[in-house]
Amino acid sequence: MISKKLIGLAAFAGLFFAGTASAQSIVGTDHDLSTVQGTGGEICVVCHTPHNSDTTVSEAPLWNHETTAATFTMYTSPTFDGGPPNQPGGASKLCLSCHDGTVALDAFGGGGGTPGNIIGGGALIGTDLSNDHPISFIYDSALATTDGGLADPSAANSGLGGTIDADMLFAGNMECASCHDVHDSTIEPFLRVSNAASAMCLTCHNK
C-alpha cells in the first residue's frame, strides 16, 4: 500500500511543477517583472508573496501589490445592455493596479513604491476606460436574450473546453481575465484563445 507520506510528496511535486510551468511561461515576457526595483530578480514577487500577503484581496492568491484607488470613467453606449457602468471589480481591479498608471510598479510588499515608476507605452490604459471593452458587468442568459447579439454564456462553447460561463466569467462577470491570461503569453497580447479571424470576439458576439 502506498504510504500517506508518498502520496503527500507526489501531490507537492505536482503543485511544484505546475508552478514551475507557469513561471516558465512568463519568463522574458512583458509580465516578467524581475527587473523592477526591489524584486531581487524574482519574477512573481511584484504580484504574489508566500508570506504576509494582502488578506483583503480574494481575487488572486497571496496578493502582494498595492491596489488602485482610482475612480474610472467606464464604457457606456446606447447599444450596451449590461446595465449602469460599475467601477472595476474582481481581478480587473488587480490588473489596473499596474495598467492604470496610478500605482508604482514597485509598490509591493507593503512599500509605497517610487513616484513616476509606472507602466508605459501601449500597456498604459489609464483611468478612462470609455473606449475599451466593458468589464465588471454581469454576462448571463438574460443579458444575451435582451441584447440579441450575444451568445448564451451558459450554453455557448468557450473554445477552452467548456462554456463561456464556466471558463471565461468570474462569478458571472466579464473581466479583463475573461480574454487575457496574465501568466501565458503564447498568444499575444496574453490572449486566452486566438483571435485569428476574430475568433475570440465571435465566442461571445453573434455577428
Model-assigned labels for residue ranges:
Residues M1-L9:
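Bacterial N-terminal signal peptides that target proteins for export
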Residues L9-L15, G19-V45, T49-K207:
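C-type cytochrome heme-c attachment and multiheme electron-transfer modules
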